[in-house]
C-alpha cells in the first residue's frame, strides 16, 4: 500500500468522491483532504500530485480501484440515479414486454431514461477513471525512481494496440432465427463473435449449430425476466440452474439480462468470465459502470466489461443510425489501449436499415484491425490471454527483460516512461501486425 508521510496508512476523511492529479475521479477515503458525498456538478476536492512526495499516493489505490470497478460508489448516491424506475414498474414492463413492438418499447424506454445525458459520473461516452488513476500511480513511480523507464508486460498479445470483442445477445425467437445469417455476416468480415443464449429458450439445437460453425456460445441470464439479481435467495436458486445448464452446453461465459448485476454475488456463478458490467451505464435501467476499459478479476471470474453503446440504445433510444458514436468510443478506448467490446442483438439488426449500420461497423473494425493493430478475438480467447498474462513474469535477460510463463511467446515487454508530464509506452519487439497463431 502507498503510505502517507508519517509512514502509516491513515485517513480522517469521510468516504466520498474526489479527484487525484486533476483528472482521475476517485471514490474512497483519501489520506488527506476532503471528499464530496454526491456529484452535483460542482468541482470535486482535488488531491494534487505533490512534486516531492516520493512514491506515496495520498489514497489507498487498491480501495479506490475496487470501489470504482465494483460500482461501490453507488452506495451513497440517490437510488433514482442508478436504477431507473421502480420495481413495480419494471415487473409490469417485463410481464408485457414480449408482446410490445419495438416502437412502443423504445418510447417507454426514452421516458424512463430521460435525463441520462445530464448524469455527471461515470463520464459519458467512455469513463477511464481507473485507467487514468493507474497511469497517475505510474507517473508517481517514474518521478520517484532512479530508472527513466519501468518495464511491464504489454496488455495484448503480439503488441496489439487494443483488443476487440464482438458479442450477440439473443433475446427471442426472432433473434434465434437470424443467428445463422449473422454468423455468415461476421465471417465475411473475418470478425469472430460469441452468441449469448437464454437457457430457458429451448434452443439447444441452435447452440450446437453455433458451436459447430466455430462460434462461441455463452449463457444469457436464466429466463430474461429482469429478476435475476432482485434478491439474493432468488439469485442463488437460479445460479444453480444456470451453472448446471452451462456444464451441459460447455459454456464458459455469462451475461445477465439487461445488464443487471451485483458483482459481490458473482462467486456463485461457475464461469471463467462474465460480461454483465458496462463501462458507463447511463442508458441502462441499472445505472453505474465500472469506470475502466480493461478486463479485471472479480474473485476468480474475469470481467470483460461492455465499453461501447449497445445497438438497441444507439438505434432506438438515441435514434442515431450512424456509427459516429461507436467511432468516437473506439478512439477513446484506443487511447487507453483497452478492450473495445460490443453487444449487437440479432433481434434488432435483422431489418435492412439496422443491418446496414452493423455492416458499417464491421467494415470499420476490419479497416482498423490493419491500420491500428487491433486484436479481434472472441471472449473466450480474451479471457485465456488475460489469465495467462496475469500469471506471466518478467525475467532478467542480460541488460534487458523477457517474459516467462505459459503463452509468453505472444507477450511483449513494454516500457513506461515520462514525456514531460505525460506517461508514454514503448513496446519492445512489437510486430507489424498481431498474429493469429497460438502457443
Predicted regions and their residues:
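Terminal accessory/targeting
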Residues: 1-194, 200-201, 264, 268-269, ...
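Short amphipathic alpha-helices and their capping/turn segments at secondary-structure boundaries
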Residues: 204-212, 291-296, 328-332
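Conserved residues at the C-terminal ends of beta-strands
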Residues: 257, 277-279, 307, 345
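Mobile, glycine-enriched helix-loop/loop "lid" segments at the mouths of ligand-binding/catalytic clefts
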Residues: 281-300
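Conserved beta-strand positions in the central sheet of alpha/beta enzyme cores
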Residues: 218, 255, 274-275, 341-343
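Acidic, His- and aromatic-enriched active-site or binding-groove loops in soluble protein domains
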Residues: 214-224, 271-287
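Short, surface-exposed amphipathic charged segments that create phosphate/polyanion-binding patches used
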Residues: 232-236, 290-292, 389-397
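Catalytic cores of extracellular degradative/oxidative enzymes
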Residues: 153-154, 168-263
Amino acid at each position: 500500500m502507498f503510505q502517507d508521510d508519517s509512514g502509516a496508512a491513515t485517513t480522517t476523511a469521510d468516504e466520498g468522491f474526489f479527484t487525484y492529479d486533476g483528472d482521475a475521479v476517485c471514490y474512497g477515503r483519501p489520506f488527506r483532504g476532503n471528499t464530496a458525498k454526491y456529484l452535483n456538478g460542482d468541482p470535486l476536492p482535488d488531491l494534487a500530485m505533490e512534486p516531492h512526495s516520493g512514491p506515496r499516493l495520498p489514497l489507498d489505490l487498491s480501495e479506490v480501484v475496487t470501489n470504482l470497478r465494483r460500482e461501490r460508489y453507488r452506495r451513497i448516491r440517490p437510488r433514482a440515479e442508478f436504477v431507473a424506475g421502480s420495481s413495480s414498474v419494471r415487473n409490469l414492463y417485463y410481464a408485457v414486454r414480449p408482446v410490445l413492438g419495438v416502437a412502443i418499447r423504445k418510447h417507454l424506454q426514452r421516458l424512463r431514461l430521460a435525463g441520462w445525458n445530464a448524469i455527471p459520473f461515470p463520464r459519458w461516452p467512455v469513463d477511464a477513471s481507473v485507467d487514468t488513476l493507474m497511469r497517475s500511480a505510474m507517473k508517481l513511480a517514474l518521478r520517484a525512481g532512479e530508472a527513466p523507464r519501468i518495464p511491464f508486460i504489454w496488455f495484448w498479445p503480439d503488441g496489439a494496440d487494443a483488443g476487440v470483442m464482438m458479442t450477440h445477445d439473443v433475446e427471442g425467437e426472432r433473434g434465434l432465427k437470424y443467428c445463422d445469417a449473422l454468423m455468415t455476416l461476421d465471417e465475411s468480415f473475418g470478425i469472430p463473435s460469441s452468441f449469448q443464449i437464454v437457457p430457458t429458450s429451448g434452443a439447444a439445437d441452435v447452440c450446437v449449430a453455433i458451436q459447430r460453425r466455430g462460434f462461441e456460445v455463452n449463457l444469457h441470464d436464466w429466463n430474461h425476466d429482469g429478476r435475476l439479481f432482485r434478491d439474493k435467495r432468488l439469485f442463488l436458486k437460479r445460479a444453480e440452474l444456470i451453472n448446471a445448464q452451462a456444464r451441459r452446453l460447455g459454456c464458459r461465459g455469462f451475461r445477465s439480462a439487461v445488464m443487471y448485476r451485483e458483482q459481490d454475488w458473482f462467486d456463485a456463478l461457475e464461469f471463467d468470465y462474465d460480461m454483465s458490467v458496462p463501462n458507463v451505464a447511463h442508458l441502462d435501467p441499472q445505472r453505474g459502470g465500472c469506470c475502466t476499459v480493461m478486463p479485471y478479476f472479480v474473485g476468480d471470474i474475469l470481467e470483460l466489461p461492455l465499453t461501447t453503446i449497445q445497438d438497441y440504445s444507439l438505434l432506438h433510444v438515441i435514434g442515431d443510425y450512424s456509427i459516429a458514436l461507436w467511432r468516437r468510443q473506439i478512439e477513446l478506448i484506443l487511447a487507453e489501449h483497452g478492450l473495445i467490446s460490443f453487444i449487437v442483438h440479432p433481434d434488432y439488426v435483422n431489418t435492412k436499415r439496422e443491418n446496414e449500420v452493423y455492416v458499417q461497423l464491421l467494415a470499420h473494425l476490419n479497416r482498423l484491425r490493419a491500420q491500428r493493430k487491433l486484436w479481434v478475438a472472441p471472449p473466450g480467447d480474451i479471457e485465456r490471454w488475460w489469465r495467462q498474462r496475469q500469471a506471466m513474469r518478467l525475467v532478467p535477460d542480460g541488460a534487458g527483460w523477457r517474459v516467462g510463463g505459459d503463452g509468453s511467446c505472444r507477450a511483449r515487454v513494454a516500457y513506461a516512461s515520462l514525456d514531460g508530464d505525460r506517461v508514454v509506452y514503448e513496446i519492445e519487439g512489437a510486430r507489424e501486425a498481431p498474429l493469429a497463431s497460438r502457443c
